[in-house]
C-alpha cells in the first residue's frame, strides 16, 4: 500500500512539473505612447513566435504627438487616429493590446492638482493589470526613458514602483530596455540615454525576418512616420545589430547594516 501511495505521489508530482513546464510564459510590455513598442518590437515578434503570451500596455492616448510630417492638431482627433494605428501595429506583432487613455504628459500642464491624481491613477491601474495578467516578466523603460521623454520616464518609474510595492504571488522579473553607450554618438547622448554594456545583463538576438516584421508594424503609425521615414530608420538601425538589450532589475536578499 505504501508503495502504491508513493508511486501515485511521484506520478502526480511529475505530471504537475510537466504541466508547469508546458504552460505558456507571459510577458507584459508596458510603454507610454503608441509607437513606443518599436523599441522592443523585434523581441515581441520573436517571443510570440516562440509561444509566449505577450500583452502590450500603452499608457497614453498620444494626443500631443504632432510633428512636421502632417497637419494633425493635438487633441481628441489625433488620439482617435493613434488608437487605430496602435491596434494595427499590435495586430501585426501578434500581441494582445491594452490601450489606456491617459493624456500625454499626464496632465503636467495642470500643475500638482491635475498631474498627481492622474499619475497616481495610472500606478493603481498598472497594479490591477499586473494582478490580472500575472506575467512571468515585465519590460518597460529604464530611468533614461530612451529619449529622456518625461512620459517614458514616468511610465517606467510607475511600473517599477508597482513591482517593488509588494511580494507577488508568483516569481516575476522586471527588465528595463536599454542601449549600449558605445553604440551612441556623442558623450552627451551617451550620458542622456546610454548604459555601459556590463549593466545590460540580458542581450537577446533576433532574426532579420523578425526585424522586418517589426518595421512592418511601424508603418501602421502613419501619423508619426511616413513610409519613407520608416524605411530609412529600418536601414539606419541595422547598424545597431540584431539584439535587444535589457537590464534586469536585481536586488540582494541579504540585508546589510552599512553602505560600504
Predicted regions and their residues:
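Prokaryotic Sec-type signal peptides and long signal-anchor helices
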Residues: 13-15, 253
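Active-site beta-strand->loop->alpha-helix modules in alpha/beta enzyme cores, enriched
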Residues: 18-169, 259
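The feature marks non-catalytic terminal segments
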Residues: 166-260
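Alpha-helix boundary/capping residues
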Residues: 11, 133, 162, 218-222
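Sec-dependent N-terminal signal peptides
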Residues: 4-13
Amino acid at each position: 500500500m505504501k508503495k502504491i501511495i508513493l508511486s501515485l505521489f511521484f506520478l502526480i508530482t511529475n505530471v504537475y512539473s510537466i504541466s508547469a513546464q508546458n504552460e505558456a510564459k507571459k510577458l507584459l510590455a508596458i510603454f507610454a505612447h503608441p509607437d513606443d513598442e518599436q523599441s522592443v518590437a523585434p523581441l515581441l515578434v520573436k517571443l510570440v513566435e516562440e509561444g509566449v503570451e505577450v500583452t502590450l500596455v500603452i499608457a497614453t492616448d498620444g494626443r500631443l504627438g504632432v510633428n512636421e510630417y502632417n497637419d494633425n492638431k493635438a487633441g481628441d482627433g489625433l488620439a482617435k487616429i493613434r488608437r487605430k494605428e496602435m491596434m494595427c501595429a499590435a495586430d501585426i506583432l501578434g500581441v494582445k493590446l491594452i490601450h489606456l487613455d491617459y493624456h500625454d504628459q499626464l496632465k503636467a500642464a495642470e500643475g500638482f492638482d491635475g498631474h498627481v491624481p492622474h499619475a497616481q491613477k495610472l500606478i493603481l491601474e498598472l497594479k490591477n493589470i499586473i494582478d490580472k495578467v500575472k506575467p512571468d516578466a515585465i519590460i518597460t523603460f529604464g530611468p533614461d526613458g530612451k529619449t529622456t521623454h518625461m512620459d517614458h520616464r514616468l511610465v517606467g518609474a510607475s511600473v517599477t514602483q508597482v513591482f517593488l510595492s509588494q511580494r507577488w504571488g508568483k516569481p516575476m522579473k522586471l527588465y528595463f530596455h536599454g542601449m549600449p553607450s558605445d553604440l551612441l554618438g556623442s558623450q552627451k547622448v551617451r550620458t542622456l540615454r546610454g548604459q555601459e554594456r556590463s549593466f545590460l545583463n540580458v542581450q537577446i538576438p533576433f532574426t532579420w525576418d523578425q526585424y522586418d516584421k517589426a518595421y512592418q508594424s511601424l508603418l501602421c503609425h502613419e501619423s508619426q512616420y511616413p513610409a519613407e521615414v520608416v524605411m530609412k530608420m529600418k536601414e539606419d538601425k541595422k547598424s545597431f545589430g540584431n539584439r535587444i538589450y535589457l537590464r534586469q532589475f536585481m536586488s540582494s536578499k541579504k540585508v546589510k547594516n552599512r553602505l560600504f
